[in-house]
Amino acid sequence: MDTSDNLARVGIRCSVRDLAPMVGNVPHFEQQQADYYNLFNLRRRKQPIQSAANFQNLFLIAALGSRGLTSAPLLGETLASIIYGEPLPISEGILHNLSANRAWVKKWLKGSKVE
């Protein structure tokens, strides 16, 4: 294989299985696993569920995939609003669907283990 003409190009995009980007606080996995090990039963019994444990002052915007150029400005504004406590440019429901721990919570709600 001759690669001397340098015509090849490679690109890598970060994405997750559900193809939605992630924005917000970085979740503390070990603490959430301890807090939510019984999430399925708590929800079934309609008991209060505590807020998810996150690392303080550690935030992320990740998994933008192939649409990162179009979604990055809105996600950047969302993250700035989270950090500074300003009104969010997106709804709470959308923000929940973009949280970094969403896959873990879905499994815990089904009663499955997360490793």
From Swiss-Prot:
InterPro entries per UniProt: FAD/NAD-bd_sf (IPR036188)
Name this polypeptide is given: Uncharacterized protein HI_1536
